[in-house]
């Protein structure tokens, strides 16, 4: 089937946006726009997350965007939703099903900042969203919700280790602060030093107070 320039068609809910009929173009889903927006957010900042910038980066016309999103604000909400689902909800569900041993789960949680390129990329996205949150209420609300959810999950781990409710919350806050610090201060220390810090925090967090 021939497609005219600057024309889009819909195949089973997926938009095909074609600028040049000379060659095939990529099928775009809403998630493709969300991922592209996240990349621009990390590399250039929130002010550059615009429909024209994303369309140019994806090699499509702006019309494809409006098949999936009502506005730029709608896209930004989806970016925050995707980030929250990937980094908080799916993570806690995955860890919850990985082991019933709270000691093993604690080791898994503490090791999260060191899990290769995927962890590094997740940290870059999170730092970009936190920078965005300093000037945008919607982003700040998403960050606050994610922080509260993660700290709450950590507190459940410490409760399972036998600590009282108040102490479990305090330890959860300290552990989460360490995890955030490892992302922010990722250039501090070589891999061996980072492992040493991680092992120290693991021992410290499981040690009862005198």
Regions found by a protein language model. Give the residues of each.
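N-terminal intrinsically disordered/low-complexity leader segments
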Residues: 1-28, 209-210
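Hydrophobic alpha-helical connector segments
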Residues: 78, 92-123, 175
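Hydrophobic/aromatic-rich alpha-helical bundle segments in the mid-to-C-terminal region
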Residues: 140-144, 159-210
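Solvent-exposed, amphipathic alpha-helical segments
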Residues: 32, 36-44, 90-94, 129, ...
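Residues in soluble alpha-helical coiled-coils and helical-bundle/repeat scaffolds
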Residues: 70-74, 78, 96, 100, ...
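Helix-turn-helix
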Residues: 29-32, 36-74, 78
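Short, basic, alpha-helical segments at the C-terminal edge of helix-turn-helix-like DNA-binding modules
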Residues: 81-88
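Amphipathic alpha-helical packing segments from all-alpha helical-bundle domains
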Residues: 88, 104, 119-127, 134-162, ...
């Amino acid at each position: 089937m021939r497609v005219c320039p600057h024309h889009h068609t819909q195949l089973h809910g997926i938009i095909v946006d074609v600028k040049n009929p000379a060659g095939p173009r990529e099928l775009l889903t809403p998630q493709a726009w969300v991922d592209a927006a996240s990349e621009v957010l990390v590399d250039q900042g929130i002010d550059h997350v615009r429909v024209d910038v994303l369309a140019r980066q994806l090699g499509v016309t702006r019309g494809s965007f409006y098949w999936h999103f009502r506005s730029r604000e709608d896209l930004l909400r989806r970016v925050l939703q995707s980030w929250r689902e990937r980094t908080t909800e799916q993570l806690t569900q995955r860890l919850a099903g990985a082991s019933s041993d709270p000691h093993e789960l604690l080791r898994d949680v503490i090791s999260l900042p060191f899990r290769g390129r995927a962890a590094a990329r997740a940290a870059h996205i999170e730092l970009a969203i936190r920078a965005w949150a300093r000037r945008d209420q919607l982003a700040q609300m998403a960050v606050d919700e994610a922080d509260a959810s993660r700290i709450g999950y950590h507190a459940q781990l410490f409760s399972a280790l036998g600590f009282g409710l108040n102490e479990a919350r305090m330890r959860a806050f300290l552990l989460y602060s360490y995890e955030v610090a490892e992302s922010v201060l990722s250039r501090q220390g070589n891999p061996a030093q980072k492992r040493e810090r991680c092992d120290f925090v693991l021992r410290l967090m499981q040690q009862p107070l005198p």
